[in-house]
């Protein structure tokens, strides 16, 4: 484990506010995106992920003005997703100050999109987002549109396909829909299966309820980064508390 493990707070944004739900529903307000992002930057987060969670459903573009406002306030890598369908969308978001973009639904409808974008912008700034749900023993399917539509695609095979070769995605954002917001920990079998299947970093997402869960994602799930929302948004823990807890478990982090 040579590289430091990243702790990444996630900003799910709906109607201009940071929100958090349970299994993609039961939404609660968690504040203004710019203020929340600024706080995480000051707390020592390694990155921030901004997801415009209704852009794909509404068929509209990502909130560029909000990306610009956040980028002006934070000095850590910013990944943006939601409503990205073509190269022009990526260019606009990167020009607004984002460092990376993440794509979910659009890649399902156009499997060559990741390859095209990686060629144009570099695979290091393209993240494939996978929302997976268990459909059988050791088998997970991919869902899109905020978890509303089942695609019939196997999550492990999709992760391999989207990251293979020189022009695959440079990172996987893996969310367990079964665990999202439930606070019982990551789906460690899913996380491990994807981490073992791909040669790029995997961000584990969905289910963090305490600091021990973050370490489990790394030590048992083999994740390269751990994402959380609820435990940070509502003041249960700080980023520094999370990092110190992981360090105590022998995990290399940036303090």
From Swiss-Prot:
EC number(s) given by UniProt: 4.3.2.10
SUPFAM superfamilies registered for this protein in UniProt: Ribulose-phoshate binding barrel (SSF51366)
Main location: cytoplasm
One biological process term in Gene Ontology: L-histidine biosynthetic process
Enzyme class (EC, first level): lyase
Superkingdom to which the source organism belongs: Bacteria
MF terms (GO), sorted A to Z: imidazoleglycerol-phosphate synthase activity; lyase activity
InterPro entries: Aldolase_TIM (IPR013785), His_biosynth (IPR006062), HisF (IPR004651), IGPS_HisA/HisF (IPR050064), RibuloseP-bd_barrel (IPR011060)
Keywords for this protein: Amino-acid biosynthesis, Cytoplasm, Histidine biosynthesis, Lyase
Biological pathway: Amino-acid biosynthesis; L-histidine biosynthesis; L-histidine from 5-phospho-alpha-D-ribose 1-diphosphate: step 5/9
Active site per UniProt: 12, 131
Subcellular location(s) per record: Cytoplasm
Catalytic activities: 5-[(5-phospho-1-deoxy-D-ribulos-1-ylimino)methylamino]-1-(5-phospho-beta-D-ribosyl)imidazole-4-carboxamide + L-glutamine = D-erythro-1-(imidazol-4-yl)glycerol 3-phosphate + 5-amino-1-(5-phospho-beta-D-ribosyl)imidazole-4-carboxamide + L-glutamate + H(+)
Pfam families xref list: His_biosynth
Key word Nucleus present: no
GO-annotated cellular components: cytoplasm
NCBIfam families: hisF
Subunit structure: Heterodimer of HisH and HisF.
Role description: IGPS catalyzes the conversion of PRFAR and glutamine to IGP, AICAR and glutamate. The HisF subunit catalyzes the cyclization activity that produces IGP and AICAR from PRFAR using the ammonia provided by the HisH subunit.
HAMAP family xref list: HisF (MF_01013)
Family under the similarity heading: Belongs to the HisA/HisF family.
Protein name: Imidazole glycerol phosphate synthase subunit HisF
Species per Swiss-Prot/TrEMBL record: Vesicomyosocius okutanii subsp. Calyptogena okutanii (strain HA)
